[in-house]
Amino acid sequence: MATEQIQHIAIVGCVHGKYREMYRQLSEYEKSTGKEISFVICTGDMQTLRYEADLVYLKVPPKYKQMGDFHLYYEGKEKAPYLTLFIGGNHESSNVLLHLYNGGFVCFNMYYLGVCSCININGLRIVGVSGIYKSFDEKKPYTYPPSPNDVVSLFHTRNYVIQMLSNLSQSSQIDISLSHDWPQGIVMKGNYKQLYRFQPGFKKDGASLGSPINKVILNTLKPKYWISGHMHCEYHAEEGPTHFIALGKIGYKNAISYLDLPLKQKTDLEYDKDWVCNLIMTWPAFSNKAQFPDLSYSISELLSKRTKELDKKIIELWEKYIGLKIIYDSDTFDIQFTSRRFYIEKIYNELNIN
C-alpha cells in the first residue's frame, strides 16, 4: 500500500513587518525537523509598506510607525523563500491592499487574498476574510483611490462579505478559513478559563469577543480549520466540525504552528471556480470605480441568478482572458486594479444577463 503523501503547511499569526524574522524561524524549523514547508499562511498585520509615503495609511500609535522589512522584498533585495498567502489585519498599509481588494501578489511569492476570496492550492480550498469588525463601518462602501482620511476605516470588515462567501461550501467543503478577528463566541468553545488566567482582559467581553461577521461565515461554511490572529495569543477551540486555532505575533514563541494535511494532488495556486462565478455575477454592485459596493444592490439577489450554464460560460471566459492559475504580476498595484476590473466587466457583459 502506498504511503499517504502529506503537505506541511506553516500557519502564522501577526507579522507586524518582521518578514526576515518569520522566514528565519521557518527555515530553522525545516533544518531542525527535516520537514519541507509546502507554503505559508499568515493571518494579518503584514504591514506591506513599500516606501515611507505608505506610512500615512498605517493606523498605529506613532511609536510603532516603522517601515519594517517588506520594502526589501518589494524592491527585490530579499525574496520570500516560500509561497506566502495572507489576509489583511488592522495594522496595514491599507492603500496597498485596497488596490488589490480582489486579491493579488504584493511582491514575488507573497499573495494577498483580498477583502475576501477563495483560492485553491494542492487540493485545498482556502477562504480569507480581511480586517476587523466595527459595527459603524460594516455597511460603509470603499472609496477609490484610497485617501488618508479613510485610514481609520479601510481595514474594517464590511458585512457584504457574508453574502459573497455564503454559497462556497455547497460544491465541496472549505478546508481552511482565515480571519484576523476571531469569530464572535469562539472563545467559549475552548478552555476559556485557562485563557482568562493569561489574558484577564478578555473576560469582560466573554462570548461577545470577536467578529459577528466571522461568526456567521464560520457557521455557514463550517471549514475544517479556522485560523486567526489579532489577539496575540495561542488558543484552540472546537465549533462543530471546525477546529479553531489562534496564534500570536512574530517575535514570540506562539506565533507559528504547522498543519500536516493529506496531499491528494499537487497543484499550483488557482482561483476557486465558485469564487470566480460569485465575482462575475456581483459585478453590477462593484462597477462604480469611485465607490463600491453599491448598497442599492442585493449581493444575494445577484448571486441567485447563477445557473450551471452561466457558471460554465463564466469559467470558459475567465480561462480565456485571465486563466485559473494565479500568476505573479509585477505591474504596479493601480494598473492591476484597473486591469482586473476591466476583465471582470468584460466577462460580465459577454454573459448578456438580463
Swiss-Prot record:
Which EC class does it fall in? hydrolase
Q: Respond yes or no to whether keyword Manganese is given for this record.
A: yes
Q: What is the effect of changing C14S?
A: Loss of RNA debranching activity. Fails to complement a DBR1-deficient yeast mutant resulting in the accumulation of lariat intron
**Protein name per UniProt:** Lariat debranching enzyme
Q: Name one GO cellular component term.
A: perinuclear region of cytoplasm
Cite the InterPro entries for this sequence. Answer: Calcineurin-like_PHP_ApaH, Dbr1_CTD, Dbr1_N, Metallo-depent_PP-like
Q: Name the positions where a divalent metal cation 2 binds.
A: D45, N90, H180, H230
- List residues binding RNA: K59, N90, H91, K134, H156, G201, D205, H230, M231, H232
Activity: how regulated? Active in presence of diverse metals including Fe(2+), Zn(2+) and Mn(2+). Binds two metal cations in two adjacent alpha and beta metal-binding pockets. The activity is the highest with Fe(2+) bound to the 2 metal-binding sites. The activity is slightly lower with Fe(2+) bound to the beta site and Zn(2+) to the alpha site and decreases further when only Zn(2+) is bound. No activity with Mn(2+). However, another study showed activity with Mn(2+) bound to the beta site and Zn(2+) to the alpha site. Mn(2+) appears unable to bind to the alpha site.
Q: What is its main location?
A: cytoplasm
One of the entry's Gene Ontology molecular-function terms is: iron ion binding
Which residues are recorded as binding a divalent metal cation 1? C14, H16, H232
Where, per UniProt, does this protein localize?
A: Cytoplasm, Perinuclear region
Tell me the gene name: DBR1
- Start and end residues of each stretch annotated as Lariat recognition loop: 130-158
Q: What does this protein do?
A: Cleaves the 2'-5' phosphodiester linkage at the branch point of excised lariat intron RNA and converts them into linear molecules that can be subsequently degraded, thereby facilitating ribonucleotide turnover.
Question: Which family is it part of?
Answer: Belongs to the lariat debranching enzyme family.
**Keywords on this record?**
Cytoplasm, Hydrolase, Iron, Manganese, Metal-binding, mRNA processing, RNA-binding, Zinc
How cofactor binds (record note)?
Binds 2 divalent metal cations per subunit.
What EC number(s) has UniProt assigned to this enzyme?
3.1.4.-
